[in-house]
Swiss-Prot record:
Protein's recorded name: C-1-tetrahydrofolate synthase, cytoplasmic
Catalytic reaction annotation: (6R)-5,10-methylene-5,6,7,8-tetrahydrofolate + NADP(+) = (6R)-5,10-methenyltetrahydrofolate + NADPH; (6R)-5,10-methenyltetrahydrofolate + H2O = (6R)-10-formyltetrahydrofolate + H(+); (6S)-5,6,7,8-tetrahydrofolate + formate + ATP = (6R)-10-formyltetrahydrofolate + ADP + phosphate
GO terms (BP aspect): 10-formyltetrahydrofolate biosynthetic process; folic acid biosynthetic process; L-histidine biosynthetic process; methionine biosynthetic process; one-carbon metabolic process; purine nucleotide biosynthetic process; tetrahydrofolate interconversion
Subunit structure: Homodimer.
Region (Formyltetrahydrofolate synthetase): 310-937
EC number: 1.5.1.5, 3.5.4.9, 6.3.4.3
Binding site for ATP: 374-381
Subcellular location: Cytoplasm
Length: 937
């Protein structure tokens, strides 16, 4: 009597082991989950039985299994779309398609559509093809052959040197079975229904695997004594003794064969349960593999071809072939489904990624600021690019978060903002120009709101209360209705009614008339071009406007409050609320008028629905960068978005069982201007809003800039650089370090370690650099290191990177804000002026006092402060260099950004739309016949 190779108990053992494996991983990583999708089309009862069996087994093993049942008439196209979605979903680890499919759907096309890394059936050409190679490493092996090999091993049946005959040549069983036996050193003969003298061939076999799908195809007299018989077949034959009228049998004549064979598998109860068990094993293997890959997250560095002298920025950028952005995304753990591609080298990242990675602890958060800016340029953006490249060279995942530059300066005098030398963001032409159109969306939203303001005043001035109310509440069918956005205004007015017919005449008047006071309108139109002649204009001159003219102006698009909202929004809902509460004017009673009062808040959000998603790009060395938002640094926060930072921090973050300090990656972002402006706003506005806590500060300084702050002669665009800036002068550098020391002091007030990066130029001497280092350390910096990233890329900034790693991993910090928002407005301004600028105090003009009273009366007194002042001095006076003292900051006016969520006092006249110089940068910009842009810098 043959040994019964029973598989039911073995399959149960496999499921128990899988459950234990999953539980073991969950004990250290509670967020680990194993997910299987079973796709079925139609409702065949035999398919339903198999699906229920697989689902039950999956649940027993601790696997999350979803049965996705599509209707019988689903199109092949729609089925392929569904599979594509599961392929791209990083939370799905295995996909199986329950066969057969309806006749109108091509099974080959559908099964091949399953991604190889999720093909847990092991059916696809990639996995089968790799299996056939001698050294092939398929991601998955077909479940039935894998289960048979497991049965043979469990029962101690040695196949090495034996002659195995496999009957059946399907891609599911026969072919992969023959390969597995051959790889186990058996000699294999593959037969099929057309094989001649098949009985004679089978009689030579030590092992027979029958998988031909014909009941009792293999007769007992075909088998030699002591053969091992593996029966894969499961066939239904009539049996009057059974309640169902049929019974299941295999491809081998079991009752007679068991008298000849030494071992045989029963049907059912052996190969079937093990097939399902191996399917589950494949799913768990896939989940473990995905988990391992999700923790790897290390981009491959692109090599640099350094040249001396260093070529132009655009030459360097064009000499590097960027990675395909999808490949870079995959390297850092962004799923394809979480991307919206804009060509090959940039893609928007969907905000849903934050939900998937919500369990991760944040990576290290670093802000780059600088000393007080000079016409030389200190190179914060270049340092940001070089630093993330350097961190990547040290095997740390590093992501840059930077602002999208405005086209105004690009075509004006400043040029682009993609970094420089061998520390750039690429493709630099796309970075500096339209990118993904976010700034154009800001322009459209801002101008729509401006149009809504003037249009509303026009219609209120030309219609009666009744006519205005009637037109605002148009009839749908035979019923008058409020538009959904109107309920926000009704709530603001305290009118708790939903039917327009129920409002009293007074309520109708209050609802319909905004009564905007034209002199209080603070909302300008925008464009992304420097144009001084649009600073002050008159609108409404056409006769069709019936004499309703007013003076207004244009701002640069990045100066719009919409851009500030984009930078400070924490999600789509938050952006909608912020846009709706933007104050554009006051009414004639002194009450604020908002975008939602105008009914345009929702439309603004629609225009910005894509702009809210950060754009993934890369540095020259192929490290990731998230480019998003670009608000002014004087009248706004001067930093990239909260959402970009949050996404980057999760991508660079750690799982619960990883070392949160040693294994975390780095997010390096930049604050505009210096510590007194950009950094102060970054902490007190951006971090206050986001709740994120930075780990370290990098202050960028240069020898030339410190000489200017030490009393060196003034410099300006187009003028020769005085000789003192080209020769060694250690004393002048030390005097200028008073400015650096003040910025270090400012930074230390937030409880964070400070690393000074000395941006190196060829004219700098070792003595000058040593002097800066000494002064920086004396002022409280954790470290001060020179950096040559402009000429050498990431390797040139390794010293700064190592100092930063030490500061984040080994130096204690306790982040704190500078002031409590519940302090009076004047007190908050005074704290900033004294602590950040070194002032003795502040002085409010009568207009500023009037604004202060208005904002307090309107309920905006608990907002943070965003002082607009010159960037060229720690004080309000651009001519005061170094670290001035004994001065009072005059506050000439105050403005409100209610949507963005801050008040910005004006300590200087700030131009919100620059002009163009005599020779703008556009003189140098052109395009070659092959489409290459030339002259962009």
């Amino acid at each position: 009597m043959a040994l019964l190779l029973e598989g039911t108990s073995l399959a149960r053992k496999v499921r128990e082991e899988l459950r234990e494996q999953i539980s073991s991983i969950k004990s250290v990583d509670p967020y680990f989950n194993v997910s299987l999708k079973i796709i079925q089309v139609g409702g065949r009862e035999d398919s339903n039985v198999y699906v229920r069996m697989k689902t039950r087994a999956a649940n027993e093993a601790g696997i999350s299994c979803e049965h996705v049942n599509f209707p019988e008439d689903i199109t092949e196209y729609d089925l392929l779309l569904a599979i594509k979605g599961f392929n791209e979903d990083p939370t799905v680890h295995g996909i199986i398609v329950q066969l057969p499919l309806p006749a109108h759907i091509n099974e080959q096309i559908i099964t091949e559509a399953v991604a190889p890394e999720k093909d847990v059936d092991g059916f696809c050409e990639t996995n089968l093809g790799k299996l056939t190679k001698r050294e092939g490493q398929p991601l998955f092996t077909a479940c039935t052959p894998k289960g048979i090999m497991c049965i043979l091993k469990h029962y101690g049946i040695n196949v090495q040197g034996k002659h195995a005959v496999v009957i059946g040549r399907s891609n599911i069983v026969g072919r992969p079975m023959s390969i597995l036996l051959e790889k186990a050193n058996a000699t294999v003969t593959l037969c099929h229904s057309k094989t001649e003298s098949i009985a004679d061939i089978v009689r030579t076999a030590d092992i027979v695997v029958a998988a031909i799908g014909i009941p009792h195809f293999v007769k007992a007299d075909w088998l030699k004594k002591g053969v091992v018989a593996i029966d894969v077949g499961i066939n239904s034959i009539p049996d009057a003794t059974k309640k169902s009228g049929y019974r299941l049998t295999g491809d081998i004549d079991f009752e007679n064969a068991k008298e000849v064979a030494s071992a045989i598998t029963p049907v059912p109860g052996s190969v079937g349960p093990m097939t399902v068990a191996m399917l589950l094993q494949n799913v768990v293997e896939s989940a473990v593999r995905f988990r391992k890959m999700s923790r790897k997250r290390k981009p491959t560095l692109l090599p640099l071809k350094l040249q001396t002298p260093v070529p132009s920025d655009i030459e360097i950028a064009r000499s590097q072939t960027p990675k395909n952005i999808g490949d870079l995304a995959s390297e850092i753990g962004i799923a394809k489904s979480e991307l919206e591609f804009y060509g090959s080298h940039k893609a928007k990242v969907n905000l849903e990624i934050l939900q998937r990675l919500a369990h991760r602890r944040d990576g290290h958060y670093v802000v780059v600021t600088g000393i007080t800016p000079t016409p030389f340029g200190e190179g914060k953006s270049t340092l940001t690019a070089g630093l993330v490249q350097a961190l990547s060279n040290l095997d740390k995942l590093a992501i840059a978060c930077v602002r999208q530059p405005s086209q105004g300066p690009t075509f004006g005098i400043k040029g682009g903002a993609a970094g420089g030398g061998y520390s750039q963001f690429i493709p630099m032409e796309e970075f500096n120009l339209h990118l993904t159109g976010d700034i154009h969306a800001i322009t459209a939203a801002t101008n729509l709101l401006a149009a809504a303001i003037d249009t509303r005043m026009f219609h209120e001035n030309t219609q009666s209360d009744a006519a205005l109310y009637k037109r605002l509440t148009l009839v749908k069918g035979n019923k008058r209705e409020f538009a959904p956005v109107m309920f926000r205004r009704l709530k603001k007015l305290g009118i708790d009614k939903t039917n327009p017919e129920e409002l009293t005449e007074e309520e109708q008047r209050k609802f319909a008339r905004l009564d905007i006071e034209p002199s209080t309108i603070s909302w300008n139109r925008t464009l992304d071009v420097n144009d001084r002649f649009l600073r002050k204009i008159t609108i409404g001159e056409n006769p069709t406007e019936k004499g309703f003219t007013r003076q207004t102006g244009f701002d640069l698009s990045v100066a719009s409050e919409c851009m500030s909202v984009l930078a400070l929004a924490t999600d789509l809902k938050d952006m909608r609320e912020r846009l709706g509460r933007m104050v554009v004017a006051s009414n004639k009673s002194g009450e604020p008028v908002t975008a939602d009062d105008l009914g345009v808040g929702g439309a603004l959000t629609v225009l910005l629905k894509d702009a809210i998603k950060p754009t993934l790009m890369q540095t020259l060395e192929g490290t990731p960068a998230l480019v998003h938002a670009g608000p002014f640094a004087n009248i706004s926060i001067g930093a990239s978005s909260i959402l970009a930072d949050r996404i980057a921090l999760k991508l660079a973050g750690t799982e619960v069982d990883e070392d949160a300090k040693k294994e975390a990656g780095y997010v390096v972002t930049e604050a505009g201007f210096a510590s007194d402006i950009g950094m102060e706003k970054f902490f007190n506005i951006k971090c206050r809003t986001s709740g994120l806590k930075p780990d370290a500060i990098v202050i960028v300084a240069t020898v030339q800039a410190l000489k200017l702050h030490g009393g060196g002669p003034p410099v300006g665009p187009g003028k020769p650089i005085p000789e003192v800036y080209k020769r060694e002068d250690v004393d002048l550098v030390r005097k200028g370090c008073a400015n650096l020391a003040k910025h270090i002091s400012n930074a230390r007030k937030y409880g964070l370690p400070v690393v000074v990066a000395i941006n190196k130029f060829s004219s700098d001497s070792p003595n000058e650099i040593s002097a800066i280092r000494e002064e920086a350390l004396a002022a409280g910096a954790t470290d001060a290191v020179d950096s040559n990233h402009w000429a050498e890329g990431g390797k040139g900034a390794l010293g700064v990177a190592r100092a930063l790693i030490n500061a984040c991993e080994n130096v204690d910090s306790e982040f704190r804000l500078l002031y409590d928002v519940h302090e009076p407005i004047e007190k908050k301004i005074e704290i900033i002026a004294k602590e950040m600028y070194g002032a003795d105090g502040i002085e409010l003009s009568p207009l500023a006092k009037e604004r202060l009273e208005t904002f307090t009366k309107q309920g905006y007194n608990n907002l943070p402060i965003c002082i607009a002042k010159t960037q060229y001095s720690l004080s309000h006076d651009p001519d005061l260099k170094g670290a001035p003292t004994n001065f009072t900051v005059p506050i000439r006016d105050m403005r409100l950004s209610a949507g963005a969520g801050f008040i910005y006092p004006l300590a200087a006249a700030i131009s919100t739309i620059p002009g163009l110089p005599t020779k703008p940068a556009y003189y140098n910009i052109d395009i070659a016949e092959n489409g290459d842009i030339v002259g962009l810098s």
